[in-house]
Amino acid sequence: MPHQESESQAQAESSNEQLERLPFPPIPYSHILHCSYHHWQPRYRTITPKSRLIPLTDPFVSYLRADGIVLPPENTSPQDEDDLDTFSDDGADEEPDPSVEWQDIHSQIKSTISEFGGKVTPKLNWSAPKDAVWMSATNDLQCRTPNDIYLLLKSSDFVTHDLEHPFDDCVPDTTETTESSDAQPEIPYHLVLRKYVNFNPALEFRCFVRNRVLLCMCQRDQNHFDFLFGLRDTLRSRIQAFFDEHLKDSFPDPNFVFDMYIPAPYQRVWLVDINPWAPRTDPLLFSWLEILHMRDPIGIQEADDDAPEQFVRLSLNGDNLTILDVGGNEGSDSGSESEAEAEGDAEDDDDSPFLPEFRLIKRDDPEAYAFTTPQYSAHKLPREVVDASLTGPGGMSEFLGKWQEILAKQEQEDTESEDGR
C-alpha cells in the first residue's frame, strides 16, 4: 500500500511538471547570441537610438562578477613616488583602484559620456540594470560618470544573469560537430552606452514574432494610458510596416521578440531591443502559453487546405451561363444570390489583411495604475517585506509586529550574554 501511494504521488508530480512546462521549441545557443546587442545593432544601426559598443576585457568581466562594490576614485591624477612618500598616511586603509587593470575601458567610458553630452544609459549584451535603479541618485538609468555605470552594473541581478546564466534552458546547435556541440560558445561581452533620452514610457511597445509573422503586440508600461486607444490603429500600422520593411526577412531567426519606441507625432519608429523567443523574456500583457497557441496566417492557411474540396459545374448554352452544382449540390435561382453573397464575403475575408492583436491596459484592468507597486521591488528589499506589503496595511502591520518581537528577543539575549560575563 505505501508503495502504491508513493507511485501515484510520483505520477501526479510528473503530470504537474508537464502541465507547467511551456511548449517551446528547443532554444539553440545561436538564438541567444543573435539577440545580443553587439550582434544585431550594427545591422540595424540606422533605426536604433544612438549608442556606442565597448568590447569588454576579461579583467573587467571579472570585476563585474566579483563580490562587493569597489569603485575607482573619482579623479585620479598621476603622482611621482616622492609626492606619494611625502603625503602618504601609513594609517590610511585605502581600497585599491580596480580600474588599474582596465584603464582603456575606463577611458572609453569617460570619452563616450562626454561625446553624448554628459548623460548615458548602460546595458550589457542582453539586459539593462533596470532592477538596480534604486541605487541611482536619479532613480533611473541616467549615468553621468563611469562610477554611476559601475554601481548599476554590479548591483543588478539582470546583469548577473547575463554573466552567469546566458544559456540556461538552451540546447547546442544541430549544425555544430558532435565533438564541440556540448560546449557553450564563447560570449564576446560588450558594454552598451546609449545617449540618454527621456522616453515617454506610454509609447514603448513589445512585439512578438513567430515564423516571421508579427503575431501580437502590447504596451510595455504597466499603467493605463487613455490616449493610446485612439491611436491603436495608427500605431499598429506603423509597427507592421516597420516590421515588414526592416525585420521580417533580415533577422537570422524566425521567432523573436522586439521592443520599439514611437514618439509623437508617431511617424518615426525606433528599434530599442531584440529579445529571445524564450521563457526568460517577459510576455507582459500576454502569457507565453497564450502566445504559443495563437494562430497566425500560416496556420490558418494550413487549416483551410485540409477542408473538403468544393467545385462548381457550369452549363454553357450559347451566351447563357447556368450554375448546375456548387460543392456537389445543385444551385437554384433563389439560392444562387445568397451563395454568391456568401462567396463574396468569403473572398473579402481571404483578402482582408491579418491584424496582429494589439493589447493595451484598460481603465478597469487589474494591472492599471501599477505605479502603486514599484517595478522590480523584489530586487530592493527582503522578500518577506515585499510579500507583506502586497497584502495591504494588515499584512504590513503583522510583519512589523513580528519584526519588533524578533528585535526585542535579540536585545534580551544580548543583555543576558553581557550579564553572564
From Swiss-Prot:
Bias kind Low complexity: ranges: 7-17
Biased composition (Acidic residues): 79-98, 336-352
Record-level GO BP terms: eukaryotic translation initiation factor 2 complex assembly
Residues annotated for Mg(2+) binding in this entry: 273, 275
Residues noted as binding ATP in the record, renumbered to the chain: 123, 126, 128, 130, 194-195, 204, 206, 220, 259, 273, 275
Annotated organism of origin: Aspergillus clavatus (strain ATCC 1007 / CBS 513.65 / DSM 816 / NCTC 3887 / NRRL 1 / QM 1276 / 107)
Pfam name, any one: D123
Family per similarity comment: Belongs to the CDC123 family.
GO molecular function terms listed in the Swiss-Prot or TrEMBL record: ATP binding; magnesium ion binding; protein folding chaperone
Region of interest called Disordered, as start-end residue ranges on this chain: 1-23, 70-101, 324-356
Keywords tagged on the record: ATP-binding, Chaperone, Cytoplasm, Magnesium, Metal-binding, Nucleotide-binding
GO cellular component terms, semicolon-separated: cytoplasm
Subcellular compartments: Cytoplasm
Name of this protein: Translation initiation factor eIF2 assembly protein
Lineage: Eukaryota, Fungi, Dikarya, Ascomycota, Pezizomycotina
The organism's place on the tree of life at top rank: Eukaryota
Role noted for this protein: ATP-dependent protein-folding chaperone for the eIF2 complex. Binds to the gamma subunit of the eIF2 complex which allows the subunit to assemble with the alpha and beta subunits.
